[in-house]
């Protein structure tokens, strides 16, 4: 199944191409831990974004906290810019139920009121449980509920998509 | 079985650090680290405990501990109710349980308990419904686990590791629930040498059994230390026959710049507060470059947030 998924780096390049025509230099890029940050860092370079890349860990905003508790390794969010009235490109690796994106938007608003938020994902795998749609998706495919798409990063920085 | 843990190892209550596994302590400290960022944001709140009701049940007054628990709970978006209940015959045994039953009927989710009697938090924890967690905010001479944890958090932040440290706890160990919690945490986290320093009248008999070295002389006890933890001296100890006078105590066991110079040059100085300046610690030391007393207060909020979040969500280790 692994071999059937496209190369992640090719997908990121494709994603950057689709974003570029409407990407303003003052836009800030924010990735969602962990995979979204890896993708955001690549997009940041490809789109020649002027502001530093931001990172969100949405663990404190999850709607399933009371059921499953805290993720054991919460990383602090890092937004090294003022969000007020900024255009934000929110980036995640895989869009599934939409709950992670909802949590990320809730957290962003605790840092300020952005002018707008646009969503870019590497893969839109379907299975949405909330009315959330990506503005940019490099790959759209239907994946059965029992399967997961994972983005992993090797020590040399190489990104790989796998289906399990 | 440890009453603080569920059969599958999750944290159910926090009553004492005695007997808690190292992995649990480390998990709490790691979680606190992730909460540090929240206090520095413009909106100092996360929605983790939204809709939860936390009752600060203080049978013994303590403004600072109560306030830090309250801030921590509010930063987690919980609803907090403070109950300061004067210690009297009304706060013993069945009367305490009546209070707890009433608050449980108001759909409490967590009790933060301070009481002058050792074991009060355990007593309440044995009684509460399964969905309610109890945090001991200090009981008699027994334990003050969140203070112990915030001290460990402070040490880790300034020293990085525990395995190569010499830590001295100075003062009234006999009456100190804080010292007991510190000793349990330090030994569990692998500090190779924990020293207690104080006059014979203020050190418990057999304290060596807790795995500490005993010193009655500050110069010998402080030599080569990485961390110096000063304890608060309660005024009532002066009135009893345990100590001749505050001046005499300060002369032998007060931390002055001269005595601190005997520890390692990069040693940090800690104090659980509130301080008696000129009794257990000199102002030059309390406000000096080696003092980490104010960071301790800041860290206390993150640590208490971590404890409450893990209790409410389950602390799987």
Curated annotation (Swiss-Prot), chain B:
Record keywords: Pyrimidine biosynthesis, Transferase
Protein EC: 2.1.3.2
Molecular function in Gene Ontology: amino acid binding; aspartate carbamoyltransferase activity
Which pathway is this protein engaged in? Pyrimidine metabolism; UMP biosynthesis via de novo pathway; (S)-dihydroorotate from bicarbonate: step 2/3
According to its UniProt record, which reaction does this protein catalyse? carbamoyl phosphate + L-aspartate = N-carbamoyl-L-aspartate + phosphate + H(+)
What residues bind L-aspartate, as annotated?
92, 177, 232
* Cellular component aspect of the GO annotation: cytosol
- Pfam families in the cross-refs: OTCace (PF00185), OTCace_N (PF02729)
Binding of carbamoyl phosphate: at which residues? 64-65, 114, 144, 147, 273-274
Q: Which residues form the signal peptide?
A: none
Q: What InterPro entries does the annotation carry?
A: Asp/Orn_carbamoyltranf_P-bd (IPR006132), Asp/Orn_carbamoylTrfase (IPR006130), Asp/Orn_carbamoylTrfase_sf (IPR036901), Asp_carbamoyltransf (IPR002082), Asp_carbamoyltransf_Asp/Orn-bd (IPR006131)
What top-level branch of life does the organism fall under? Answer: Bacteria
Q: Name one GO biological process term.
A: 'de novo' UMP biosynthetic process
Q: Please tell me whether the keyword Kinase is annotated for this protein.
A: no
Reported function:
Catalyzes the condensation of carbamoyl phosphate and aspartate to form carbamoyl aspartate and inorganic phosphate, the committed step in the de novo pyrimidine nucleotide biosynthesis pathway.
Complex formation: Heterododecamer (2C3:3R2) of six catalytic PyrB chains organized as two trimers (C3), and six regulatory PyrI chains organized as three dimers (R2).
Q: What family is it from?
A: Belongs to the aspartate/ornithine carbamoyltransferase superfamily. ATCase family.
Q: Which PANTHER family does UniProt cross-reference here?
A: ASPARTATE CARBAMOYLTRANSFERASE, ORNITHINE CARBAMOYLTRANSFERASE, MITOCHONDRIAL
Q: What is the recorded name of this protein? A: Aspartate carbamoyltransferase catalytic subunit
Give the species. Thiobacillus denitrificans (strain ATCC 25259 / T1)
Q: Which gene encodes it?
A: pyrB
